[in-house]
Every structure is written in structure tokens, then in C-alpha cells.
UniProtKB/Swiss-Prot annotation:
Residues 456-489 are annotated as: Disordered. Residues 54-227 form the DH domain. Pfam families: RhoGEF (PF00621). This is Putative protein tag-52. GO terms for cellular component: cytoplasm. Gene3D superfamilies: Dbl homology (DH) domain, Pleckstrin-homology domain (PH domain)/Phosphotyrosine-binding domain (PTB).
Amino acid sequence: MNAGKEFNYYTYQSDSSQGSLQKAPDENTDYFTHKMNSYLPFDMSTLYANQPTEKIQILQEIYDTERTYVKALTIVDEIFIQQLNLWCPKSKKCFRSMFGEISAICKTHQILLESLQCKPIAEVFTKFVPFLKLYTSYASHYPNSLKIFAKLMSRNDFRKALTKIEEDPRVDGKKLQTYLIMPIQRIPRYIMLIQNLMNYSTEKDDMTNLYKALSGMQGLSDQIQSCMTAYENGERLLQIQLNFGLDGHILEPGRVLLKEGMLYKRELNGSANYQETVVFLFNDILLYGIKRISVMPLCKYEPSAILSLRHCIVQLDDIGGSIFIRCGDVGVDFTAYSLGGVTEWYNEICDAIDNAKKLRDTLRKESFKQKSLIFDKGFWQRNRDKLRNMITADMTGNISRVLTRKKPAPKLEESDFLRGQWTTSTIASNQRKRKVATLEDEEEDVFNMLSSPNLSQRKRKATLQENTPSGVGWTASPRSSSFRKRRASTLRNKNADVTDGNNYLSHLVLNDVTMTQPYTGLNAFVGTPKSRTPTDDDYDSDRDYVWTDDEEFVSDDKKIPIRRVASYDEEDRRPRDFSEVRRSVASEPPRRHLAVDDIRKLSYQQRSLEPFNMVTEDDDEDDIIDIKVKGERPRPWWETESAPPAIKNQKSSIIDSIRNSCAIM
């Protein structure tokens, strides 16, 4: 502690008999006490000696209430605000919103209190009315201040600090809420005191100034009331918008809620079916919907339609006790529990329509441009699509790959084929590679044996029959027997050399079998076949020509040929059979196991993504979401039966968990 603070901390204002020093009050306490003592009492009779006693009493009441009010504002400004900012520094932003302009109001009324001691009261109020517009901002944010106060009370540090401040004797035992509501009550108190003062005033100038002050106070009070009403109306509009689960259309500038209640909507086909409907009447639109049972606390209603009042035609049926409203292509028939309720709603709607048409002439921009906005099943369908997109985006990459199968499949290369298209096991692909390498060695041995000059004709024929190419990727052709006869007759020539053997293998063997792989090691041994011009065998003369629409004869030079379909399937590279039955591949190695992983992923994707629980009983069968990929093949029975029971039963649990965490409707 330095010398200055130590000197201020102790004082020698003590009795002469006591030698010890007394502890001085704190600096803040001295400043607050000095400021509170500066608001001295004042006798208004000294300033208005010639006035009646009743008028002096009213003037004295104005000054005394103003002095008490300024003291209360000083307590809030000097004790509550400063101490809370000191003990709860993390909540300073909340404190600024909670107290608002109360510090500026306090300084204004301090000057007003000093002016009442030396100037006529009518002149003072006339001069200070423009500065009292600070109450408009404070009053409009007062409901929000109460919400912030309730939120801060949930914090432990704020409660402890507030309790210590309220226990301070300088606060006079009042709560913080009592001080916050004082500015709201002050303006009506001014109006009442000025009206009482005008009853005892006789001078013309004094009456004129008092009337100006009274008019200014009444205008300020009306402005404060309108601001508070607008704030409450905005809060109510936002609550209605959230209750219907909408992102807009309700909370708009200038929109006011006029009436709300429950009506019964009757079907227009004449049947006696009534549906309980909640109706909200605004100054420019009419909103109605039905109650919905939902786990979410906000979404209480399901919107049916929004009607623009300027385009509505209303008819009252006194006999049937109903109101018929038509807006464009929308027509609705409402009734109430009693006939008096129907008449009351009819009068309110008619008055709102008349006012909307009158106000429209002075508006440059309309808040609701459409005649009617119908929230049909398509509205909820779009929300279901949003939910489905969110679910799809959160899935793994494997399911995303299945969803993108509608795109054209890329052309497979040799490496892609050797790995296998659908088989997930690397053992099968490695076995296929080893089989191809073994087949290359066998063909090379056969070629060496055939080209040997010491080989007899019988042994050559037997060797060729035993080593006919039949293995992975080879399929025997139906014409194999005829080609074998020609091959046997060709090999009878004892002078066959290596060139004839190469020509034989390139022209006869390749035509004899069908290759299902685009390229293997056999091509290096056999040699690449030479390019030739297409023949008649490459086309189908009966089916592959395109005829004109009038079916006239087209000459051969004008016919448009169509290539045959590839002899192998683009998906798993198996040979294609045009009778929709796949032929078995000759000497194909047995698959290690079925592609269970891929089948489970596909089954899980098709069983879990479709939000069945979101489809209500009112939806038609055509409205059910179908997320089946376009161009997808029908699923075989083994894929359907291979999904484990845990994945099958997981459909409802996933959607229920999503519905408990999302609220898009």
C-alpha cells in the first residue's frame, strides 16, 4: 500500500482521548454518499409563495417524487451496474442489453431535478420533453431485459453477486426488478401530476406551457405503448412461424395479429365431415392449419394455406352457420361451435379485408404478393427430399458409389479385369493370374511339340486334342467339331512348318473360340489378328436394318447397319447370351465365396435410406419416395436373402433417431 492510499485509508478524525487511528470509509462509499447527499430536499413554497396551497402541494409532490426517482436511478448506475461488471466480467454484454439506456436517463433527470429548483415547472417540462424520448428505446427493450435477467439467474456467479448487492444497506432492501420497472412507470406519473397541476393554474402563459408539456408527455406515452405493442406482436409472429415450422411468410414488417382461434373446416363436397382447424387472422393475410402430433415442441401445427385478404371473397351462411371464403382457386368453408362465434369471425374478416384494401393504396411494396399459398403434400415432399439428401450425404463412400451407378460405367482396362469386377476376394484374382500364366506355358509347350520334325502324325494329333485351349476366359464354339476336322486334315501334311502353325492358330483357333477378356498373355503367343473388312456375318440382315416410317423399300446402299451387341457383359465380363441366360465358362475356377460385402452394402442402402416413417396415411401411393437408381438391374433372390436380420430390422430405428434430432416439418 503506497503512501497516498495509506493516508486515505486511515484518518485522524478521532477523539482527543483516544490515541489510535480510526478506519476511514472506502473511496467508492465516499463518492456514492456524497452524490446521494447532493440531492437535497427543497421547499417549493419559497419559489411559489403567492400560489394556492393545493398547487404548492402538487409542486412539492413533483419535486419529491423526482428526487426519489433520481436516487433510485443512481443506485442502479453506481452500485448494480458497476458491481455486476466487476464480479461477472464475462456477462458484460448481457448487462448492457439488460440495463439499456438507464445511465443516460439517470443523467437527464439529474439535470431536470436541478432545473426544478430555479425555473418554472411548466417551462422545465416543455424544454425536457424531447430529451425524454430515451424512454421509447428503453420501454421497447424492457421485455427482452426481463428475458435476459431470467437467463442470467440460471448462472451461479450472477446469483451470488446479485444476492450480495441486494443485501447492501445502500440499496434500501429493494430487488433489481423493482428498479428496472421504475422508468416504465414514470411517464404516466408525470401525466397525472401535470393534469392535477392544470386544475389550479390561472395564468395564461402557465396554462399554455403546461398544455404543451402535457401534450408532449401524452405523445411520448403513446409512442412508448406502441413500441411495446410492436415488440410483443413481433414476438408473437415469430412464435407462430416457429409453431408452423416455416422459414418465412409470417414475420414481416407491418404485419399485425388481429385474431386467433379454433374453427371447424367442412368438406366442400357437402359431407358432414368437420376437421378442427387453427386460424390466425392478420391485417393482410389469413393463415389456417391443423394440429399435428410431434415430438418437437415448436412444430405444433401443419400449415394448410395462406390467403391474401385483398383477393378474398367472404360469404356468410346464416342458416347453415358457416363462413365461405374464396381466394383465387382456393375455397374453404369454416364453422364455429356457436353461431355467435361465426358472426364474430365474419365481422373481423370483413373489417380486415376493407382495411387491407384501403391501406394498399398508400403502400409502395406489398408484404404478401401472392393471392394464395397452399402448403400441400408437395411442400412436405420437398422437406422429405431435404431429409433424404442429408441422410445420403452422411453415408459412407461405399453407398455413395452405389448411388452413382446411374452414370455410364467407365471402360475397363486389363488391370481392372484381372482384379475382378464384383469379386471382393483378392485370392480369386491372384488365382486367375496364375491360371493365365500356366496356360501360356502350356501353349508354348504345345507349339514346340507341334513344330518338332521328329513328332509322328498320330502323336501330333493326340497332343493337339489333349491341349485344345480351354481354360479361364475360353469358351468352346458350337462349330468346334467341323473346325477340328479341317485342322486334322491340315496337319496331315508332313511338311508343315512353323509359319503354317502360326497361320493355323491365328485364323482357325481364334474363330473357333470366343475370348471374354480384352487382352491376355495368349495374344503374345498367337499374334494379333489382322484387321479385315466387315462381312455379312457381322450384321443381321433380318433385324438390324432401320426402315423408314412409311415402310417403303430402301435400297441396299441406303440401309443403315447396326453393330451387334458386344459378346461380353460390361459388368462382370462374362459372355453374353441373347436368350438372357448366361452360359457357363469352360473350366472356370470356382468362386471362393459370394460377394457378400457388396450385397450387404446394396441391401443396407436400399433398406435404410427410404424414410418410410415420414409417409402418412393421407399420402397417396404415388407420393411414396422411390430412391431406386435408374437403370439398376433387378436384384436376384440371393442378394435379397443374404442380408442379415440385424440390418433388416435397422430400418425403423435409424429413421426414428433422425426424426428425434431433426425438425424440418
